[in-house]
């Protein structure tokens, strides 16, 4: 074996070992398993896990949030119809209905292809991989981060 062939063989061996430890892009889940998914890290790689028991919150049951509900409903209707829609940031104290509004919209529009992916704040760095995973899907996805608070220094 020549020096060049030896070098190539060693380089291929090194690459194989590196590929084994580097994180892989998330694999596609069983999209029919749920209308909601959670992004989780498993062994250094991201995975979308189906949410087995999606909250059955309905928009009609949410009170004292009429202006927010109307805006979110209108925006989500546009989004699932494939029209321009705005990104949404709901702010407020704990227990004011932010998450409930999102889950109620999911239930309202799931039959029209709306899906939800919950991502922890620490995993937002993987957002490009998640977007790549869903880019060619026919469904419309809400990326949902339930606790996006920022501490001093972040």
Located regions from the model:
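Dynamic helix-loop-helix/coil hinge segments at AAA+ ATPase domain boundaries and subdomain interfaces
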Residues: 2-5, 47-71
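Phosphate-binding P-loop
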Residues: 51-53, 77-85
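Phosphate/oxyanion-binding active-site loops and adjacent basic polyanion-contact surfaces
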Residues: 64-69, 97-98, 123
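Pre-Walker A adenine-sensing motif
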Residues: 67-81
């Amino acid at each position: 074996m020549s020096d060049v062939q030896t070098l190539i063989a060693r380089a291929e061996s090194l690459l194989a070992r590196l590929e084994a430890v580097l994180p892989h892009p998330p694999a596609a889940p069983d999209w029919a398993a749920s209308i909601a998914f959670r992004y989780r890290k498993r062994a250094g790689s991201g995975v979308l896990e189906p949410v087995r028991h999606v909250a059955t919150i309905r928009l009609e049951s949410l009170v004292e949030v009429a202006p927010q509900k109307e805006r979110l409903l209108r925006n989500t209707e546009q989004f699932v119809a494939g029209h321009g829609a705005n990104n949404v940031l709901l702010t407020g104290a704990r227990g004011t209905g932010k998450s409930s509004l999102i889950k109620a919209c999911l239930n309202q529009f799931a039959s029209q292809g709306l899906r939800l992916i919950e991502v922890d704040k620490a995993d937002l760095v993987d957002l490009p991989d998640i977007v790549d995973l869903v880019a060619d899907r026919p469904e419309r996805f809400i990326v949902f981060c339930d606790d996006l608070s920022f501490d001093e220094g972040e």
